[in-house]
A protein has these predicted regions:
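Helix-loop boundary and gating motifs at the non-cytosolic
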Residues: 1-50, 196-238
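Hydrophobic core of transmembrane alpha-helices in multi-pass small-molecule transporters
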Residues: 13, 92-109, 284-299
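Intracellular juxtamembrane helix-capping segments at the cytosolic ends
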Residues: 26, 108-121, 296-313
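Transmembrane alpha-helices of Major Facilitator/SLC transporters
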Residues: 49-57, 140-143, 236-256
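Structural signature of the two symmetry-related core transmembrane helices
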Residues: 69-84, 165, 261-276
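Cytoplasmic helix-loop-helix junction between adjacent transmembrane helices
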Residues: 100-135
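Glycine-rich segments within core transmembrane alpha-helices of 12-TM secondary carriers
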Residues: 130-146, 326-334
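Symmetry-related core transmembrane helices of the 12-TM Major Facilitator Superfamily/SLC fold
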Residues: 159-177, 347-364
């Protein structure tokens, strides 16, 4: 790894540890504070709507000023989000404020992180570098959710939010130490032009992959409501999932370059594993969580290899914007369908898996890829 990759990896580790102490538990915190399941789904729908609306303004800010400025906006929004979680009250106004700050934090964080990901990963070793950064990310996540669950079960949310904010702030140090030979340059934002050039099968595959985040959100609620109503259960299962993710990324990450069937196999097994997890208890649930980490990472590496490879044909800002809009459109449409037409949590998960399974019908179009 070169110096920038090391600095970026430090940023990824610290920020991942800090935000995952509490982020996965937000829907459960709302549920425990008196919000109904459908109200929590409404909150998640608003998050995705705001995320979609904020996509262009956030990329404009990063293009006009810098992605580091956008990262600061993400940090400030994260801090406000944590403060709001300490003063929860049951009202639509609170849900709107919380969902907006969460969306702004996520856009500020992920747009800047993805931009620097695109810059530090070279075309010659995409899979190996991404696998290593991914391992570092999951090292930050692996214990953070469990530690967060312990703090929520035995202490107070105030202590957890303070720790989370401090770690997130510290993560800015390596981010600001990034130093590239070619400085960030503003460009003309032409997302429609970029969208037209990207093969539509790729657009669908990128969007469908992001539905995994919807599955994770729903499963967090499902496990708490129907399996065991404490934070530690979620923390332990997440620890198991992230452990298997690290093992797979370390052992098989480089093989993604050579294996063309990884995408189809990963989508198939992801759907099977989540169906297994949906119908599991006790030891089977632990096994399903372990397999979830393996096949989710297999799916992620298959998608991200093509995402980064294709990015070398475009300006990063426009490419980042198109991907951002794509993922938010897919999530918003699916969550809206769930909110307006489905009442059963288990059926919600099955519907999302159904849409993800369509990825097996498509394949990545590599006609645009440069051979340099």
């Amino acid at each position: 790894m070169d110096n920038n990759q090391k600095k970026f990896s430090s940023y990824v580790f610290l920020s991942s540890f800090g935000r995952n102490l509490i982020e996965d538990f937000i829907p459960i915190i709302l549920y425990k504070c008196g919000f109904s399941l459908i109200e929590v789904i409404f909150y998640y729908l608003l998050v995705n709507i705001f995320s979609l609306l904020l996509s262009y303004p956030c990329v404009w800010i990063s293009n006009k000023y810098s992605n580091k400025v956008l990262g600061i906006i993400g940090i400030i929004s994260f801090a406000i989000l944590q403060i709001l979680l300490n003063f929860i009250y049951k009202s639509n106004l609170f849900i709107i404020m919380l969902s907006f700050m969460y969306a702004l934090y996520r856009r500020g964080y992920w747009l800047s992180r993805r931009f620097y990901n695109l810059r530090v990963i070279r075309k010659q070793n995409i899979s190996s570098t991404y696998s290593l950064i991914s391992i570092i990310n999951h090292l930050g996540v692996i214990f953070s959710t469990y530690i967060g669950s312990l703090l929520l079960d035995f202490l107070t949310i105030k202590i957890l939010t303070i720790i989370s904010i401090v770690l997130f702030l510290v993560s800015l140090i390596p981010l600001y130490l990034l130093n590239f030979e070619h400085k960030e340059k503003s460009c003309k934002l032409e997302p429609f032009k970029t969208f037209k050039l990207i093969p539509k099968s790729n657009i669908f595959l990128f969007g469908a992959y992001e539905l995994i985040n919807v599955i994770k959100f729903l499963f967090t609620m499902y496990l708490f409501i129907y399996v065991k109503d404490n934070f530690q259960t979620i923390g332990i299962l997440n620890l198991i999932t992230n452990l298997s993710t690290i093992i797979f990324a370390y052992l098989y990450g480089k093989k993604i370059n050579k294996e063309k069937n990884f995408l189809y196999l990963s989508v198939f097994f992801v759907v099977i594993v989540y169906i297994l997890k949906l119908n599991s208890t006790s030891h089977l649930l632990i096994l399903a969580s372990f397999l979830e980490g393996i096949f989710n990472k297999m799916y992620e590496l298959s998608i991200q290899k093509n995402f980064y490879l294709l990015s070398k044909n475009f300006d990063y800002q426009n490419y980042n914007l198109v991907y951002e809009v794509t993922q938010n459109v897919f999530r918003t449409i699916i969550v809206a369908i769930l909110y307006f037409f489905v009442n059963d949590l288990k059926f919600m998960i099955i519907i999302v898996l159904f849409f993800i399974s369509f990825s097996m019908v498509f394949k990545f179009d590599s006609l645009l890829l440069k051979n340099d």
